[in-house]
Amino acid sequence: YYFQKDFGYEINAIIDIPNKPKKFFQKQKLLKLKNSWYFHDHIKKTGQKPDLEYLNNFERKYQINLQQLTINERIFYRFNDFYKFSSDEVLSILEQECKLFETIVDEIKPNYFITPLTAFHHQHLFYEICRKRNIKTLMIYMSKFGHRCVISQDVNKLDFNPKLSHFQSKNRNFNQLLDYFKSFDIVKQIDDYKKKIENSKFKKLQAANNFFLNNDYSNQTHYTYYGRNRSKVLSHEIKKSIQLRKRRTFIKKNLSRIIPEKQK
């Protein structure tokens, strides 16, 4: 809503989505964008050797450990059950991402970068580039209180150091404070959301219908979807569902769920 208002700034966006929602973003009138980049349109399966000299120079220029980013990317390594990336593929993807992000920052010279909590290496890479180039970053993430978010430059770290003396006391006792905390229970918020989604047969059928009946070529154009097809995804979901049931059964049979009151 507030981004629709004209405050004298220009809005640019890097859009990281599969192929299906792309038409919506191309036609949307909710937000006026001066420039937009569809991230996966710029990352290709080239088959060419990566430019190691460029990557080394990039690391020195920005003081960013690219190896650390890729090693911690679940898509590239053992947590990906659908596709095994070669070292050259990983480095080629990284090279294209670095060049794309440098081009974008050089072109628009942003004053601010607004992002959700970075979940993939390429998101965190752009975040680090902005930080190194003194671009103000605003990261939005869930707080320890349910139904509340925090905006700061670093995750789980406020941009200021509030002092207790700056807050007016409401003279609540411990139990009242505990009740207040429980009223914003983040665990309950997540559980309620999961139950709403998991218990909705209509949404499950709708998702299955979209997956099996509509064509989506993201597995050919998006490296995050490489190796996926309908039969593999179905087989994978069945396998994971069986594993989940087995583990739940094991936990219920073998682990205590009640902590003795006097146990230290």
Predicted feature descriptions by range:
Residues 2-98, 145-258:
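Conserved N-terminal ligand/cofactor-binding loop architecture of enzyme catalytic domains
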